[in-house]
């Protein structure tokens, strides 16, 4: 078991180095229907017909106004924007990422290659371990003029008992980007909006700012403290890394 764990960790670190090497290599090279009354030969001059027509039109209009009003009330969502900052770190101990090769070059990332991953999450102030990310990236474009790559990403952020947030969109190795918030659970139920991703150290250190809409209640205070300004040098508090009492949220996702 120890040897297997060591081997898996070694493979993970090799994958991280290959991702970084692939990134560095670019620096050197790269949404009615209608019906006619003419054929039915019905005279529109008939008083009875006109009265019935007006009555029907009035009733129909009232019906649709009622339906539309009801639908609007049923599907209205909170539009207040709530901000949430989190850090993501790959600390080399989750056997992540992996690379599933679909391209023809075994020694470098190719279009279509799949990169499943899971990393650790910390609060924006770096004092508490809150959970993990888990998802999948697909390499869709080499961008030589930017000296990097473009991935299409679909993944989730897990916050223990608080629930999770799912996102989807572009992941760029060379600049900041925005992804769509596609939903959530727990305190994040009904969430939508966008999240800004800041690449601090590719691919091991990232900073996210969520602009959350659709969440009825205020976010938990322990998730929304003042964040540490992002930089390449930031790191979690030692107590949070060690998941000591008081340095994690309740039942954090591991």
Curated annotation (Swiss-Prot):
Misc: The four allene oxide cyclase proteins (AOC1, AOC2, AOC3 and AOC4) are encoded by duplicated genes. They are very similar, and most experiments involving antibodies do not discriminate between the different members.
Subcellular location: Plastid, Chloroplast
Species this chain originates from: Arabidopsis thaliana
Annotated protein name in UniProt: Allene oxide cyclase 4, chloroplastic
Expression (tissue specificity): Highly expressed in fully developed leaves.
Tagged with keyword Plastid: yes
Species classification: Eukaryota, Viridiplantae, Streptophyta, Embryophyta, Tracheophyta
InterPro entries per record: Allene_ox_cyc (IPR009410), Allene_oxi_cyc_Dirigent (IPR044859), Allene_oxi_cyc_sf (IPR034871)
Presequence positions on this chain: 1-52
Physiological role: Involved in the production of 12-oxo-phytodienoic acid (OPDA), a precursor of jasmonic acid.
One GO CC term on file: extracellular region
Assigned keywords, A-Z: Chloroplast, Isomerase, Plastid, Transit peptide
């Amino acid at each position: 078991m120890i040897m297997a764990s060591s081997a898996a960790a070694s493979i993970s670190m090799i994958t991280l180095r290959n991702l970084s090497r692939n990134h560095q290599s670019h620096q050197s090279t790269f949404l009615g229907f209608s019906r006619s009354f003419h054929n039915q030969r019905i005279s529109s001059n008939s008083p009875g017909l006109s009265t019935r027509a007006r009555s029907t039109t009035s009733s129909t209009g009232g019906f649709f106004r009622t339906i539309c009003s009801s639908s609007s009330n049923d599907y209205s969502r909170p539009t207040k924007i709530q901000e949430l900052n989190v850090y993501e770190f790959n600390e080399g101990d989750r056997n992540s990422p992996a690379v599933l090769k679909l391209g023809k070059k075994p020694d470098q990332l190719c279009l279509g290659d799949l990169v499943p991953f899971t990393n650790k999450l910390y609060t924006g102030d770096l004092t508490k371990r809150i959970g993990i990310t888990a998802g999948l990236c697909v390499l869709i474009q080499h961008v030589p003029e930017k000296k990097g790559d473009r991935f299409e990403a679909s993944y989730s952020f897990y916050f223990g008992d608080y629930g999770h947030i799912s996102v989807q969109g572009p992941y760029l190795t060379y600049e900041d980007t925005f992804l769509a918030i596609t939903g959530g659970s727990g305190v994040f139920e009904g969430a939508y909006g966008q999240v800004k991703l800041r690449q601090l150290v590719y691919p091991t250190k990232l900073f996210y700012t969520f602009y959350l809409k659709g969440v009825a209640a205020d976010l938990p205070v322990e998730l929304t403290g003042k964040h540490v300004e992002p930089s390449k040098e930031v790191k979690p508090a030692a107590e949070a890394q060690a998941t000591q009492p008081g340095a994690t949220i309740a039942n954090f996702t591991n």
